[in-house]
Amino acid sequence: LTEDEILRLKSQSCLADDWGKVTVAEEFSTEFVHHTRFSGEVCLGVFHSEFMLPGGIRKHSGLRHVTLHNVTVGDNCCIENIQNYIANYEIGHDTFIENVDIILVDGVSKFGNGVEVSVLNETGGREVLINDKLSAHQAYILALYRHRPELIARMKEITDFYSNKHASAVGSIGNHVMILNTGSIKNVRIGDYCRICGTCRLYNGSINSNEVAPVHIGHGVICDDFIISTGSHVDDGAMLSRCFVGQACKLGHNYSASDSLFFSNCQGENGEACAIFAGPYTVTHHKSTLLIAGMFSFMNAGSGSNQSNHMYKLGPIHQGTLERGAKTTSDSYILWPARVGAFSLVMGRHVNHSDTSNLPFSYLIEQNNTTYLVPGVNLRSVGTIRDAQKWPKRDGRTDPNKLDYINYNLLSPYTVQKMFKGRETLQNLRHASGELSDIYSFHSAKIRNSALVKGIRFYEIAIHKFLGNSVIKRLEGIDFRSNEEIRARLKPDTAIGSGEWGDISGLIAPKSEIDALIDGIESGKVNRLKSINAEFEKMHSNYYTYEWTWAYEKLEEFYGIRPEGMTAEDVIHIVEKWKEAVVGLDRMVYEDAKKEFSLASMTGFGADGSRLEKELDFEQVRGDFESNPFVMAVLKHIEVKTALGDELIGRMQRVSEN
């Protein structure tokens, strides 16, 4: 600063503890700096541009009514009306900060990295150390693989290394950030293009906003010990303590959460979360819903759904899992510990700790305090198909650098291996208790005879569908001249994929690959967060290659055909079965959808009118059945899949004629 500039600043009511420590950019002008106090090392950029605000008002960049202590201000910022002060921050360019109580960093901070979140078990023992690069899969392993202490120690070490590397006594506020009418911000790192409006308190965290996926923090929000990832919205009185919020999440309407992890595309409104592991697409909208000590993904919680992790004995020590795609109805209740199979529906109050992990696509219904299980029935539900279609469409992530690798497939080696086990379990129950039993018992749940018989059939249809799909995909677009060529094409490209598969919160992969990664972490070969995420990406991108290896092995088990000796006739047999399964399943889905257009569904329509008016009113609001887009999609699906199967059968017939 020149003597002249210092005099001009003093005349504009500016003060400094030591003017010698105030440095400015080349083209700095004192014109837009009023009522400002400087202490410590302060570095100012230029003030050339204006901000256009809602209502048509223009504000020139500059400093007005603010105290700065050890602050670097980028070019073209507007900072005014800071009630207390801004201390120890680097502020980017084109940032607008107005009417804020205080923004400071006190001592060295890790900005939320390394915070221990007591997920699943409230009393501890499954802590996940959150960090900027945390993926659902990494957190899954850290929370659940406690039987491998060496792995856990290594993963903590890797996170600590990252946290310490990014620790600092100076916070940063990015470029093009807007902070308005906000209370206290302490030890928070704020990324580019973030908008913070009317927020109450932010303490010890990172807001990883960027230009392609800005973060919005809204009115009345309170966050302590947190990390918020790109593209997320935390609004309207949400309260978070010790939480990780993944990419493109929406939390608002007074949602309160503690010790919880929310991964990509989660939504939480009105209700409460405590120690939950919310994998991708966990959605809860209702005031009366408590999710506690559970693991969820692709999950919809009905109003009044809750769980208990406390039996008034040794404290809140229990936990449970709803595998991917599970849903709860209104007023459902589960007493943990329990495990609910994938894509199942939970209805009523369940207190018997059942484990239906190997009976996916089921209904769990309570009658007189007894859990009744209807296996496989959700496979023909129109809701399940609608869910599978809506999730990819609702992926709100705009950041090209995705943290979670999400597999949306309804039928995958993960769910189909469970169907194989489920089918075997049901057949064994039938064998053990006799075919004429009215009710069978399984893991403290009851299964009615008719439900058991249908369950076996549903699972068989789904297995036909999956294996047939895999064969068709594998033989797609090639003109074969002989059975040898068919066999050569059917041979898997890799041995990886055989054996068990796992769903590590959204990512479906062979257990052998997950174990290989874990061994790599234990041995120190994989020793950075980005290397762990790269391994998950590799598993995800090779999914279809690994899937075929698994399906190839199952052909013999299910069809009794040795794949090494497979002929065109065998392929035709598999495809015929597949066509039957696909069309059969689509017909069931079609019939299920039809129920939504029955006379019972018209109850309450056509108020004050006759039956004709009721039907007309219904049609105006809901449309008619045949032109419903979903129904049309099902019919189209039947058509397309039949043609696909016929095309392969045609190619195979040419081979068998040779």
Label each PLM-derived region with a short phrase.
Residues 84-85, 89-91, 95-96, 101-111, ...:
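Long, charge-dense tracts
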Residues 100, 106, 367-658:
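Long, compositionally biased intrinsically disordered regions
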Residues 10-16, 24-47, 51-63, 72, ...:
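Glycine-rich hexapeptide-repeat left-handed beta-helix
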Residues 56-64, 159-180:
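Right-handed parallel beta-helix
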